[in-house]
Amino acid sequence: MKKLLYIASICIASLFSACDDYLTVESPDQLTSSSFWRNQSDAEAGLAAAYSQLYLMTYSGDMWSFPEIKWPVEAYREDIIQLGSDALNYPNWVELGNYTYTNGNSQFSYYWQCYYKGISFANQVIEKTAEIPDENIDAATREQLVNEGYFIRAYYHMQLLLNWKEIIVRDKYITDPAELSKPLSSREDAWNFIIEDLKRATSLPATRDADNVGRATSGSAYAYLGFAYLTRAYEEATNKDSYLASAIEAFNQVKGYELVNNFSTMFSGDNKNSKESIFEIQFSMSSANGATYRTQFHRWIGVSELGGWDEILPSQTLISEFKKEGETATTGRYDSRMYATLFFNCDYYNDGNGRVYGYDYNDWFDNKERVAFRKFMPSTYEGLNQNYSAINVPLMRYANVLLMKAEALNEQGHPEQAIPLINEVRSVHGDMPPMAGTSQEAVRAQIEHERMIEFPLENYRWYDLRRWGK
């Protein structure tokens, strides 16, 4: 993935020129979609362009757009989030927070455009890599790159389907303007398409070497395949049992991962691509070859007291959920995920050990009721004061697989099989004792609790609420 990061920005311009393929005259010294795909290097460059839309690059390719599109669309509608003071200055963000938005909302439009751009790039990878002469690419590499294209195409379609009622399935690279006009697909057809793409991607390598870490693997494909089946199980009651079984089967194939003991390190830049990470957006402070894979995300997440812009805050609902089980962790405090996720007024953050960037909470915050996100903030004072950060963003973690598998098992009527999976996450990440209760309803409630406090800012709550019909 390191190589892909550096070449992505170079090749995107070449692939954008494909928009002019409708013209009958081509410049002999300009790459187009018809002349670009010559060998393995070109195919890898095209794949890099497909990955690039994970960063939701718009605003002329500036990485400012990454937090300003992804989190307003995916997080502002969650009940565990509230808008910060500066966010209230942007009407299109406020619309998302108070549910008065329409499809004309600019953040929705950017989100839609960026992911369909990624789908177009992925379609080029799938179609054009297959046309590269055999002498310029070996068969195994060709197959792997095409299957990677299938994964990326499925991911973008799935994110769109999770956020809209209906989407347009784009199953081919468009070369004729007449093909742009296409009706919305049914959710059933969209799920069928996504699932088939993910099935193809399960043949990807199980692991990646250092130069390619962050690229999709078979584990990535199986994890999202299970997620797709689980979500679909709630939408199609007549096939619920079958989809739940398929979800569990997919989750069982997610192998070679473990939960990380130090929860906060996965979101501070200290433990990139950890043993728990299944699919993760890569960032780098390097600007070599014009790369811009760094962000000011820590400014966007951070509160004003910590030099941030005050765009996003935890809601009282989230704070109450963290405190729900009381100070019952083995540490004698609340669930350890609370301290890894939030800065708040408590003995832990005011014990004189400088746990908030070398100082106590009280040294930073005049308002003692103020609660701020720690998650996705740099771990050091030096990092806090840098203009840019390069903290990776996990999109799929093993904890998610365990909790989704527990959910599927419980919905099948096997709460006794779900409970050990829940307790594993509670113990490793929260230092919490085993859950109370053994009934299906108790397990349902516990899964919701665990997901609420496990994934803040990872943007699963809205999809959970939709899946559960809440």
Write out the residue ranges for each language-model feature.
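Sec-dependent signal peptide recognition
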Residues: 2-9
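C-terminal motif of bacterial Sec signal peptides marking the signal peptidase cleavage site
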Residues: 16-18
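An aromatic- and glycine-enriched ligand-binding surface/loop that stacks and positions planar moieties
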Residues: 20-89, 167, 191, 198-200, ...
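Conserved, well-structured interaction surfaces
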Residues: 39, 44-48, 52-60, 84-164, ...
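C-terminal substrate/ligand-recognition segments
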Residues: 109, 336-423
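Alpha-helix C-terminal capping/termination sites
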Residues: 159, 163, 231, 235-240, ...
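C-terminal structured "cap/appendage" subdomains that terminate the fold
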Residues: 421-470
